[in-house]
Design a protein with these regions (language model features):
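Noncatalytic alpha-helical scaffold of FAD-dependent oxidoreductases
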Residues: 83-84, 155, 159, 192-193
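Midchain, well-structured core segments that form catalytic/ion-binding scaffolds
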Residues: 1-143
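Short glycine/threonine-rich loop-to-helix capping motif typified by GTGT followed
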Residues: 10-13, 175-187, 214
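Zn-dependent metallopeptidase/amidohydrolase metal-coordination segment
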Residues: 130, 184-223
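Short, contiguous acidic/charged loop-to-helix segments that flank catalytic cores in large enzymes
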Residues: 141, 172-177
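Ordered, soluble secondary-structure elements with a strong preference for glycine-centered loop motifs
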Residues: 63-64, 146-149, 177
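Redox- and metal-dependent alpha/beta enzyme cores, enriched for Fe-S-associated oxidoreductases
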Residues: 148-164
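Short linear capping/connector segments at secondary-structure termini
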Residues: 166-172
């Protein structure tokens, strides 16, 4: 399991592996640590091995600023000499869809960008695995060019290839033109009182204005 909020890149993830000793796993952990930047801590519990992965948390809109502990754990598990059963096959499939370091959704088939709002970002944020199955959640901040066909439907098609079902809806990206009367008035006030040139910014964070048509997030910010 790993993660604690969908909008936070998971800083920690853990698992319990049966029939594996710390000595046997350590070389794989050392190799995976060098490849991912994740730190792996091992503790034997009877006949099982507890693995704790420590990455670096970040906001889901800026996944490149962190180190995803969930994808780091999947990366390690795919390298371990584990039995070829349904659960390990599912974890390998997840790692193929969310390879460590892929913050743009390339493997999921949804990578895209546009000049106004930049590139899509993707963070695999939550994962729970138990004896009956697994459940995960990911957070994606999409550019203006994203729509149901090239984003949600494309992701569902990728998941279905591995037998995963998908639930949840896609929120359309929010955009207000820079030449709207509201934006022009706000920039004029900013420039008048700061003597700095005002410019519009596109960010991955939703902000509370997301559901207000024609609205923008605005506040005091110096260059």
């Amino acid at each position: 399991r790993g993660g604690f909020r969908i909008n936070v890149l998971p800083p920690e993830a853990e698992c319990l592996v049966a029939g594996l000793s710390a000595d046997a796993a350590r070389p794989y952990c050392d190799r995976a640590a060098a490849e991912t930047g994740v730190r792996y801590e091992l503790r034997e519990e009877g006949d099982s091995l507890h693995i704790l992965c420590r990455g670096k948390g970040a906001h889901a809109s800026l996944p490149e600023e962190g180190v995803n502990a969930i994808t780091g754990l999947l990366h390690l598990l795919c390298s371990l000499p584990l039995a070829k059963v349904g659960s390990t096959a599912a974890l390998r499939a997840l790692s193929a869809l969310f390879p460590h370091g892929d913050c743009a959704g390339k493997a999921l088939g949804i990578a895209q960008s546009d000049e106004l709002s930049g590139a899509l970002t993707l963070a695999f944020s939550l994962l729970t695995v138990n004896g009956t199955g697994l459940e995960g959640q990911f957070d994606s901040r999409v550019p203006i060019c994203a729509n149901d066909e090239n984003c949600r439907a494309a992701a569902e098609a990728s998941f279905s290839k591995f037998g995963f079902s998908v639930s949840g809806e896609m929120d359309a990206p929010h955009h207000t033109p820079a030449d709207s009367p509201l934006v022009k008035a706000l920039l004029k006030c900013y420039e008048q009182y700061t003597d700095y040139k005002g410019e519009c910014l596109a960010i991955g964070g939703g902000t509370y204005v997301h559901d207000i048509p024609g609205g923008v997030a605005f506040g005091c910010c110096m260059p």
